[in-house]
UniProtKB/Swiss-Prot annotation:
Entries under HAMAP family matching the protein: BtuD
Protein name: Vitamin B12 import ATP-binding protein BtuD
Record field: catalytic activity: an R-cob(III)alamin(out) + ATP + H2O = an R-cob(III)alamin(in) + ADP + phosphate + H(+)
GN (gene name): btuD
Family: Belongs to the ABC transporter superfamily. Vitamin B12 importer (TC 3.A.1.13.1) family.
Natural source organism: Escherichia coli O139:H28 (strain E24377A / ETEC)
EC number in record: 7.6.2.8
Compartment list: Cell inner membrane
Organism lineage: Bacteria, Pseudomonadati, Pseudomonadota, Gammaproteobacteria, Enterobacterales
Topology term for the membrane: Peripheral membrane protein
UniProt-annotated binding residues for ATP: 33-40
Length: 249
């Protein structure tokens, strides 16, 4: 798999790093670790929203060399918290994120996959927290999907499962898996270790802005590594063919 993004000694104040790593096309990479580990800070830096020490190469070019317009064509970023910028119909908000605004069937398909069919005519300021989260997710998918944007390469998601129920999480997993199979690189933060153990290809385990471990999910999410990160004991079980992590008291 080709390298989409290369990080070298990336650091930001006292909150992050220095850390190094790479993001590959066609993979799902999870950032895991306790609150305050630096996951959101790292994602914002990878998205080009902040600057600091170290270097980031995106598609072979320094990240800071990308214009905002060009960057929006090649990467999409979902921040952890955002309120509706102003009131508008959901369908209009989603259309604003499409590079090809004639692809109404694609908009309907993505909205349907996230159970937003009956929300398209509603105003963004009349949505519940979970509905708004799904609208935001649909927007970044429409922005970056190779189906309508051949230049799309990278999707960055900060705790995308927030406010989603089990069925909605499963729907999002299917969408992300399909994007990954189309060659997109996906980086997302998560607090659900078992979700990471099941769905991530690789993981970076962070604590206090430092990377404790990186590699394949099975190699990173080990009881010793997790005990170091969270200060508590874990066991890894095999249940009906699925690996599962549990904490022990």
């Amino acid at each position: 798999m080709s390298i989409v993004m290369q990080l070298q000694d990336v650091a930001e104040s006292t909150r992050l790093g220095p850390l190094s790593g790479e993001v590959r096309a066609g993979e799902i990479l999870h950032l895991v670790g306790p609150n305050g580990a630096g996951k959101s800070t790292l994602l914002a830096r990878m998205a080009g929203m902040t600057s600091g020490k170290g270097s980031i190469q995106f598609a072979g070019q320094p990240l800071e060399a990308w214009s905002a317009t060009k960057l929006a064509l090649h990467r999409a970023y979902l921040s952890q918290q955002q309120t509706p910028p102003f009131a508008m119909p959901v369908w209009h908000y989603l259309t604003l994120h499409q590079h090809d605004k004639t692809r109404t069937e694609l908009l309907n398909d993505v909205a349907g996959a996230l159970a937003l069919d009956d929300k398209l005519g509603r105003s963004t300021n009349q949505l519940s927290g979970g509905e708004w989260q799904r609208v935001r997710l649909a927007a970044v998918v429409l922005q970056i999907t190779p189906q309508a944007n051949p230049a799309g390469q990278l999707l960055l998601l900060d705790e995308p499962m927030n406010s989603l129920d089990v069925a909605q999480q499963s729907a999002l997993d299917k969408i992300l898996s399909a994007l990954c199979q189309q060659g997109l690189a996906i980086v997302m933060s998560s607090h659900d270790l078992n979700h990471t153990l099941r769905h991530a290809h690789r993981a970076w385990l962070l604590k206090g802005g430092k990377m404790l471990a990186s590699g394949r999910r099975e190699e990173v999410l080990t009881p010793p590594n997790l005990a170091q990160a969270y200060g508590m004991n874990f066991r890894r079980l095999d249940i009906e063919g699925h690996r599962m992590l549990i904490s022990t008291i």
